[in-house]
């Protein structure tokens, strides 16, 4: 079992010494330091921590905001750590302690995951409601059709089809129109 510290500051002019001090007080085997915004997922040192992680290792952070700012990213990170049979511990957020089967931590993580899912569902619901309202007001018409009525390639494909001298595959290859789109257009034209 190794104690792995992860320190992150948002920029090069911020001082990580407080985090170093707090982690060194409990004794770390190795400390990874990152100087990059927590909002970005592209964090080289965090990826090294996860790649080097072994069974029974514990990742220590002084504060959850040091490892991630997004609840969804936190859950993905926790799943990744658990998959490797390792743990995550936050010194400030003492409720998060995956180093043992702590039922309170498990409960809080489950509740937070539920709240996170609810938030995503509410966003989708509001988006659908907004689209419906915009449709009623004539402001939203959905995705623009790729092949509008004056599309030269589609019109040429229909003309070639009606001439009957080529196969559908040949027509589609020449005009760069998909088979499904051509058949859909032919169905519209014939009705």
UniProtKB/Swiss-Prot annotation:
Signal peptide: none annotated. The active site is at 10 (o-(5'-phospho-dna)-serine intermediate). Transmembrane segments: none annotated. Keywords: DNA integration, DNA recombination, DNA-binding, Plasmid, Transposable element. Residues 2-138 form the Resolvase/invertase-type recombinase catalytic domain. Residues 168-187 bind DNA. Gene3D superfamilies: Homeodomain-like, Resolvase, N-terminal catalytic domain. It comes from the Bacteria. Pfam families: HTH_7, Resolvase. SUPFAM superfamilies: Resolvase-like. Resolvase catalyzes the resolution (a site-specific recombination) of the cointegrated replicon to yield the final transposition products. GO terms for biological process: DNA integration. Belongs to the site-specific recombinase resolvase family. This is Transposon Tn1546 resolvase. The keyword Transmembrane helix does not apply. The keyword Cell division does not apply. One of its GO terms (molecular function) is DNA binding. InterPro entries: Recombinase_CS (IPR006118), Resolv_N (IPR006119), Resolvase-like_N_sf (IPR036162), Resolvase_HTH_dom (IPR006120), SSR_resolvase (IPR050639).
